[in-house]
Structure formats: C-alpha cells, structure tokens
Amino acid sequence: MAKELTLSIIKPDAVAKSVIGEIYTRFEKAGLDIVAAKMTQLSREQAENFYDIHRARPFFKDLVDFMISGPVMIQVLKGENAVAKNREIMGATNPKEAAPGTIRADFADSIDANAVHGSDSLENAAREIAFFFEPHELCNR
C-alpha cells in the first residue's frame, strides 16, 4: 500500500504546554514519519486563508484569534493510511468525547483549544501541505 502524506498542526495551547515532544513520540509510535516541520507564528491573514472553508461559520473569528494567539508547530506526516491514522491518534474534536490515550484527551483544554489540527482527507492534506510547505521542503524518509 502506498504511503500517504498528511498535515498536522500543534496548536498554540499545546505548544504553550511544552508537549511537542510527547506528541511527536505518538506520531512516530503510530508509524508516522515527520518529513517536514516548522515552528511559526501565524499572521491573521495566514490563519484566515488557511481556515477559509470555515469563514461563514459562527466560530471563524474565535478560531482565527486562537490560532494567532501563540506559535504553532506545523508538520507533514508520512505513513500507511497517514490521514486516518493521524485522525485516530488525535481523537475527537471535542476532548470530552476523545478516547482515553488520544492527543486531545490528554492535552486539549476545550473544543476550541483542542491541541492539534489534522487533515481530514487526502485532497485537503495536499492543499494544506502546499499552503505551508514548498515541495523541496519535504524530505524523503
């Protein structure tokens, strides 16, 4: 089976808790290789453009405000069924509904400050990866 790529963002709440290393360990234990990574402070424009699909939703402004509230860690993960595997280890969007042992169950504070973002499809993964990374920034592993 071909290996997939997916985008993951460790959000400002989790970066502030200094759990990047613990989250990376979970990716690697799940068989997901980190093939690109960067820490950055998103601008309002970047956050608005990245989450443009949610622009008409009532939570859009709060989401953007949260995503620019501190640095984020952005990575590209590669592995068998990477999109589904990453979403499984992230857990449900609402940490109160997330299975024990998932990233959100262990590190998220609320449905808004929910520690991580992960692509929800191969199509969105390709779009999201291209938003943050140039092709030459992805390493072969």
UniProtKB/Swiss-Prot annotation:
It holds the Pfam family NDK. GO terms for molecular function: ATP binding; metal ion binding; nucleoside diphosphate kinase activity. The keyword Kinase applies. Its EC number is 2.7.4.6. It comes from the Bacteria. Its main location: cytoplasm. Major role in the synthesis of nucleoside triphosphates other than ATP. The ATP gamma phosphate is transferred to the NDP beta phosphate via a ping-pong mechanism, using a phosphorylated active-site intermediate. This is Nucleoside diphosphate kinase. It comes from Legionella pneumophila (strain Corby). The gene is ndk.
